[in-house]
Amino acid sequence: MALVRDPEPAAGSSRWLPTHVQVTVLRASGLRGKSSGAGSTSDAYTVIQVGREKYSTSVVEKTQGCPEWCEECSFELPPGALDGLLRAQEADAGPAPWASGPNAACELVLTTMHRSLIGVDKFLGRATVALDEVFRAGRAQHTQWYRLHSKPGKKEKERGEIQVTIQFTRNNLSASMFDLSMKDKPRSPFSKLKDRVKGKKKYDLESASAILPSSALEDPELGSLGKMGKAKGFFLRNKLRKSSLTQSNTSLGSDSTLSSTSGSLVYQGPGAELLTRSPSHSSWLSTEGGRDSIQSPKLLTHKRTYSDEASQLRAAPPRALLELQGHLDGASRSSLCVNGSHVYNEEPQPPLRHRSSISGPFPPSSSLHSVPPRSSEEGSRSSDDSWGRGSHGTSSSEAVPGQEELSKQAKGASCSGEEEGARLPEGKPVQVATPMVASSEAVAAEKDRKPRMGLFHHHHHQGLSRSEQGRRGSVGEKGSPSLGASPHHSSTGEEKAKSSWFGLRESKEPTQKPSPHPVKPLTAAPVEASPDRKQPRTSLSTALSSGLERLKTVTSGGIQSVLPASQLGSSVDTKRPKDSAVLDQSAKYYHLTHDELIGLLLQRERELSQRDEHVQELESYIDRLLVRIMETSPTLLQISPGPPK
């Protein structure tokens, strides 16, 4: 019965192929002793080998020739190791031809050794088991004693026996590991030594090969790279950086990164060219990055370093420094914005616009704390040169008669302003704040048509007719739409003259000794009606007193706002009841002579210039301090953005 049932497992084995073989070394008997003395003992251990894989049992010390281990291990069978046996069984051709000779890879070799404390371990015996013979007997567990033999070519001796249990198993989930293990077989001893040093086992493919198909590394596009990838994996692994697929968009590859990445993607030749590949041969953005991701499944994730962040923080300061440098320049007034907070606003710009819209007879008006650039100084010199152009242009320029009306109101104050403008050093404009109303078109026309006149040109035009002055006053009023002359417009223009100061209205004031009271001017034109004849004295006195009062305001550091053109008439009407109070306040300047007034004005001007220099020094210090803060610790400037000024 037993003889009939034995072939059935063999027939069943034709339909079942194992993937692993499990070997259990139980014990040995009759081993030769290697120690000296009467009771010879040995320190025995057994080396178990299938193909290129080896395992070793523990050492049983001082055994009398019968050690017991009871240790097991599992070996992975090479792909196709039992296919020949299966085909031979199906064809009844006997044993497979590869089962003997140099191609007999499916053998279990058991080598028993004696451990020597000094020198090389001594050989005790060797047993070779053909796995195909065991598999032919059936797939059940086989426990059997095998005789130990001497080394090939040595004299045969009695060396004892060893008992081993062999059982075949199958793991369906690891079928793809056959192909991977075949590619791992042709490894050099040098690579295995490196694996031991690195603490790696089979290139760490045991955990990943079970889920990868066997054709993953057989891509025809990869060519020799798929076959040589593991053989050269040790050399590439230390120098390989992250592939292009794992790099961030903000990180740029350096020369070393490009060379290492390109060298890891393309294999051209066996050996050295892999390690010394130039980055110019292939780009790190090539399509081979995808192949690299397939070959090396254990890619590190990209972590952004401080160099990526630092390259982004240092993109903005150069532009801010350029804007700050432009602010320090005299001709550039560009504002600097740091993190939404305006450090330098164009607040000094409105005085510059006033300077461009001021008519010729008036000095440039600017803020008391503003530092005038070169362009503003040149504009101030040109406006100072045109200081005495108010009374000129009666026949040459009819487009600006209203401005000439404003330039003939206080002769004494105008003369003091002229001499002061002549004595000022070059580049120091007269800084006063006056309620002036003029149009930019009139300024452009006056600058184009009026020639350069002297400082004392006013004395040649003291004979202007009162009717002509009234007509110009009506035109110079901002609210008048036409050039028509009427008594009402004439009186309105003279009333407007009361609200202005430092005007250049002609007055017969002696230049030898100025009088505190205005004198009626002499005119060569026919005299008009008596109401118009009485107004010049009142208007001149009012203009002089208001001018002195505003001079007091300027010297004390006050700043007067510029009235809009639409509010001029209302301002004239509201200032009429205050004329008496203005005269009382300006009475302390009546006893001063012309030279004393000029000296007082020059003294105040020097004080203002010193204050401007001090302000400029402070601004320069703040600029340098801000640049230093931006260079050293820019985080101090990260404040919440405020509303635009």
Swiss-Prot record:
Highest taxon of source: Eukaryota
Keywords assigned: Cytoplasm, Cytoplasmic vesicle, Endosome, Golgi apparatus, Membrane, Mitochondrion, Phosphoprotein, Protein transport, Transport
Polar residues: bias regions: 277-286
Domain C2: 1-146
Basic and acidic residues bias locations: 375-387
Biased composition (Basic residues): 452-463
Post-translational modification: Phosphorylated on serine and threonine residues. Phosphorylation at Ser-357 is PKA-dependent.
Listed GO biological process terms: cellular response to type II interferon; insulin secretion involved in cellular response to glucose stimulus; postsynaptic neurotransmitter receptor internalization; regulated exocytosis
NAD among keywords: no
Biased amino acid composition, Low complexity: 357-374
Cellular component per GO, a single term: Golgi membrane
Pfam families (alphabetical): C2, RBD-FIP
Residues bearing the modification Phosphoserine: 176, 283, 286, 307, 357, 367, 391, 395, 486, 530, 539, 545, 640
GO molecular function: gamma-tubulin binding; small GTPase binding
InterPro entries per record: C2_dom, C2_domain_sf, FIP-RBD_C_sf, FIP_classI, Rab-bd_FIP-RBD
Membrane topology of this protein: Peripheral membrane protein
Comment on protein domains: Binds to vesicles enriched in neutral phospholipids via its C2 domain. The interaction is favored by Mg(2+) rather than Ca(2+).
Purpose: Rab effector involved in protein trafficking from apical recycling endosomes to the apical plasma membrane. Involved in insulin granule exocytosis. May regulate V-ATPase intracellular transport in response to extracellular acidosis.
Subunit structure: Interacts with RAB11FIP4. Interacts with NAPG. Interacts with RO60. Interacts with RAB11A that has been activated by GTP binding.
Protein name, as recorded: Rab11 family-interacting protein 5
Gene designation per UniProt: Rab11fip5
